[in-house]
Amino acid sequence: MSNAYKRVLLKLSGEALMGDDAFGINRATIERMVADIAEVVGLGTQLAVVIGGGNIFRGVAGGAAGMDRATADYMGMLATMMNALALQDAMRHAGIVARVQSALRMDQVVEPYIRPRAIRQLEEGKVVIFAAGTGNPFFTTDTAAALRGSEVGAEVVLKATKVDGVYSADPKKDPSATRYATISFDEAISRNLQVMDATAFALCRDQKLPIRVFSINKPGALKRIVLGEDEGTLVHV
């Protein structure tokens, strides 16, 4: 079976790295994620990753109460850097060549984000991990995923979550909630379905960049998506 996508951008939340822990990075969880990523890389699909920082610090969370919002957001960006380095290290142990590019300069640790370099690295079969969000406060890492996905020419943004798609209602609260196999951007907006934050969602819609929402906890889900199988929910124009 041929790959459905040549180049994808995977959005990982920081919380996904916690596993069952209350905080930080769960090594077994990150190794399982990397095993899934290795399968996709082995198929020849070019993979970029945008990673969040919510397992360490969230600029909009309670820990930032009373703090200047921009300062809190910069702290969140530094948290994504820690996650990116952990992910790169786990990939190295799995035999995957990965590069971290940061929207904030930290030259002794990672490369700065340079679009042509990122594209070249993807073409060389390396995984490129984008850290520090957009490099600007007030923008989420979802927006960074939409931005970087558009910049490097990804064919789809794969948003890894704790649920296996977009539902008509919260499946934890409403047992009758149904999963959408596909849904348009406009329909998702009209139904007030929170796929991504408004800025990220609008950017994907304007760039005609589809979003595939899937469960990061479901073994093999990432590979099935790349092979074009029905997995999660596809949000399309």
From Swiss-Prot:
Q: GO molecular function: any one?
A: ATP binding
Catalyzed chemical reaction(s) = UMP + ATP = UDP + ADP
One Pfam family of this protein, by short name?
Answer: AA_kinase
Q: Which UniProt keywords apply?
A: ATP-binding, Cytoplasm, Kinase, Nucleotide-binding, Pyrimidine biosynthesis, Transferase
Taxonomically, the superkingdom here is: Bacteria
Establish whether keyword Cytoplasm is in the entry.
Answer: yes
- What are the recorded Gene Ontology BP terms? 'de novo' CTP biosynthetic process; UDP biosynthetic process
Tell me the route in metabolism or biology where this protein functions.
Answer: Pyrimidine metabolism; CTP biosynthesis via de novo pathway; UDP from UMP (UMPK route): step 1/1
According to the UniProt entry, what is the EC number of this protein? 2.7.4.22
* Chief location: cytoplasm
Q: Which InterPro entries match?
A: AceGlu_kinase-like_sf (IPR036393), Asp/Glu/Uridylate_kinase (IPR001048), Uridylate_kinase (IPR011817), Uridylate_kinase_bac (IPR015963)
Residue numbers binding UMP: 53, 73, 134-141
Q: Indicate where this protein resides in the cell.
A: Cytoplasm
Positions that bind ATP: 11-14, 54, 58, 161, 167, 170
What regulates the activity here? Answer: Inhibited by UTP.
The entry's cellular-component GO terms read: cytosol
| HAMAP family linked | PyrH_B
Subunit (UniProt): Homohexamer.
What's this chain's function?
Catalyzes the reversible phosphorylation of UMP to UDP.
- Protein family: Belongs to the UMP kinase family.
User: What is the protein's name according to its record?
Assistant: Uridylate kinase
